[in-house]
Structure formats: C-alpha cells, structure tokens
From Swiss-Prot:
This is UPF0225 protein CGSHiGG_04185. NCBIfam families: PRK00183.1, PRK01752.1. Pfam families: SEC-C, YchJ_M-like. It comes from Haemophilus influenzae (strain PittGG). Belongs to the UPF0225 family.
Length: 160
C-alpha cells in the first residue's frame, strides 16, 4: 500500500489526465466504486502499475476470485514495467455487460511491447467486475459466472 500513498498526489497511471487521488485512487482505497466498465478497466491497469494485487482479485467476478493465483499475479506485476494505456473501444453489450478493448504498453526484456485485449465486464449488485478468461470457465450448460441464473452460453459465454 506504500506505493498507493506515494502516488496520491501524482497523475494517475491510467492516463485519464486526473490526479490519482481523484481517479483510480478512490477505487483502490474503497472510497468509491467504478461506475463504468472503462473506469474499472483503468483502475485495474493502475493496480497492476502499483502492484496492488488484492484490488485485482476483488474486482474479478466473485465466482472466479478463488481460482486466481495472487502469488503469480504479484510475481508478474513485480517483473513488468507498465508504460501506458490506450482505451480503443468501449461497448455496452447489455444492461449488465460491457466490453472494453484496450492496448497496454509495457517494457519487455529487450524492447517495448503491447498487450491488446477485448475484456468483458459484468455488473452484479451495482458493481462492475472483470470476467477473467484465463481461469477455468463453466461449460456452456452450467450457470453463468456473473450469477444471473442463466446458462453460461446464453449470458457471458456469448461474449468470451
């Protein structure tokens, strides 16, 4: 958390042109919750920059949180230098599902590299969560990860 406290007066790493305290900092300190999927995406990127792995875990859809490996996430964060974030596109898929396409620039072993992804976010009880496609997902006939009660194939599975 020391990196968070030192960053409060600095520009936010998510490149929103706001100070961290007025942007992602309030989400990291749980003073507020992201109101949009894009805000959650930006706050998760910033959490990686600041190595705030607990925030990464709690902003992943609850049914997937126990499947994450915080130690591996921490190792990855410790060995990655993030250089920038560009939001390419945001889409509202349904009232409770959105997609954010982004490009994150980071320093690789020999040169700068880019990670581009289209991430899916779901809103559960008025809070946005990231659906992690890298952990085990339900089969198409099982209940959806978002807790909607629908089968996965008729809900979030259609977007992943």
């Amino acid at each position: 958390m020391s990196e968070i406290s030192t960053a409060l007066s600095e520009d936010c790493p998510c490149q929103s042109s706001h100070h961290y305290a007025d942007c992602c900092g309030k989400f990291h300190l749980r003073q507020a919750f992201p109101e949009t999927a894009e805000q959650l995406m930006r706050s998760r990127y910033t959490a990686y920059v600041l190595k705030n792995i607990p925030y990464i875990v709690v902003t992943t859809v609850p049914s997937q949180q126990t499947l994450l490996k915080p130690r591996l996430l921490q190792e990855w964060a410790d060995n990655t230098t993030w250089l920038g974030l560009e939001i390419l596109k945001t889409e509202s898929l349904t009232k409770t599902q959105s997609a954010v396409e982004f490009k994150a620039i980071f320093q690789g072993e020999e040169c700068e590299q880019a990670h581009q992804e289209r991430s899916i976010f779901v809103k559960i009880e008025d809070r946005w969560y990231f659906v992690d496609p890298t952990v085990s997902l339900p089969t198409m006939k099982q209940p959806c990860v978002c807790g909607s009660g629908k089968k996965f194939k008729h809900c979030c599975g259609g977007f992943l």
